[in-house]
């Protein structure tokens, strides 16, 4: 009985986290696992830390909705990546392929289809991203996080499973988080996350308010690669990280409130941990608008406050943080009533049912 699976997904941490949640569970069930990603994406760094999962890099190009000279050469990179993925899948002979999206996943899903191997795509956002839109016709099943997404998917392919949250996030230890950051017990903690690539506007507005905010909060700031500010390195009550992985559960456990972008994976993790959140979604100028839809959905459900990037100023950020903290108990009560089912188990069952025997 062939129980081999190839995972794919990359470009941002959000396109890898579901795979990281799946891997330990798949191992428990006796699956042989491999990963196809890009040569230099964040997925390579994250998966390289996972024991027993060989990584196969392929060529990939970004598919854009706007004019860029790279639009003329990137399709050839995608074509090259498709041939590479086809050969890898032909050699590895998986019984199923699972994709979390991102541009590297398009060649892999097409490569699986060319080999007659079933594939499953997981779409986190309310509206499918461009990569998943291209890959969907070649996939066997498409899992969605938001029920609203089903209207964008063929009825016979779409399955609503909810959000997949990593089990280790639920095992965070607040005391370990405080030790890591040299924070004291009793003073509220604000966790700031600008996404795996960081956010200059959020970083700048936060640091402009640090002197005031540190009177009332301890702040752990995940600011993105190359964005640590040496001016604040030794400031008491303020801890900066470029990026965190193993430490994240402990940092989340000690946080009282969260300031974040509105990527679907992250906000559902905050929901699972009952962390009141202030969301600053990427603007439509900088994205396709998916984070705005995610944020508005959470705002409507009473899980989050939303500050649009075009309204982001030093003053508006400071006021929103204090307002969130003052109303944190109401947000937690709303989260307690949320319907957060076991999406991970649903996904594992679907993988087992869809695989090629």
Swiss-Prot record:
GO cellular component: plasma membrane
Domain of life: Bacteria
Localisation per UniProt entry: Cell membrane
Name of the top EC class for this enzyme: transferase
Record-linked Gene3D superfamilies: Glycogen Phosphorylase B
GO biological process, one term: regulation of cell shape
This enzyme's EC code(s): 2.4.1.227
Pfam families per record: Glyco_tran_28_C (PF04101), Glyco_transf_28 (PF03033)
Stated name of the protein: UDP-N-acetylglucosamine--N-acetylmuramyl-(pentapeptide) pyrophosphoryl-undecaprenol N-acetylglucosamine transferase
Catalytic activity: di-trans,octa-cis-undecaprenyl diphospho-N-acetyl-alpha-D-muramoyl-L-alanyl-D-glutamyl-meso-2,6-diaminopimeloyl-D-alanyl-D-alanine + UDP-N-acetyl-alpha-D-glucosamine = di-trans,octa-cis-undecaprenyl diphospho-[N-acetyl-alpha-D-glucosaminyl-(1->4)]-N-acetyl-alpha-D-muramoyl-L-alanyl-D-glutamyl-meso-2,6-diaminopimeloyl-D-alanyl-D-alanine + UDP + H(+)
Lineage, highest ranks first: Bacteria, Bacillati, Bacillota, Bacilli, Bacillales
Primary gene name: murG
Record InterPro entries: GlcNAc_MurG (IPR006009), Glyco_trans_28_C (IPR007235), GlycoTrans_28_N (IPR004276)
Keyword terms: Cell cycle, Cell division, Cell membrane, Cell shape, Cell wall biogenesis/degradation, Glycosyltransferase, Membrane, Peptidoglycan synthesis, Transferase
Biological role stated in the UniProt entry: Cell wall formation. Catalyzes the transfer of a GlcNAc subunit on undecaprenyl-pyrophosphoryl-MurNAc-pentapeptide (lipid intermediate I) to form undecaprenyl-pyrophosphoryl-MurNAc-(pentapeptide)GlcNAc (lipid intermediate II).
Recorded metabolic or biological pathway in which this protein acts: Cell wall biogenesis; peptidoglycan biosynthesis
PANTHER family: UDP-N-ACETYLGLUCOSAMINE--N-ACETYLMURAMYL-(PENTAPEPTIDE) PYROPHOSPHORYL-UNDECAPRENOL N-ACETYLGLUCOSAMINE TRANSFERASE, UDP-N-ACETYLGLUCOSAMINE--N-ACETYLMURAMYL-(PENTAPEPTIDE) PYROPHOSPHORYL-UNDECAPRENOL N-ACETYLGLUCOSAMINE TRANSFERASE 1
Binding sites annotated in the UniProt record for UDP-N-acetyl-alpha-D-glucosamine: 12-14, 166, 196, 291
Family indicated by similarity: Belongs to the glycosyltransferase 28 family. MurG subfamily.
Main location, first listed in the record: membrane
A GO term, aspect molecular function: undecaprenyldiphospho-muramoylpentapeptide beta-N-acetylglucosaminyltransferase activity
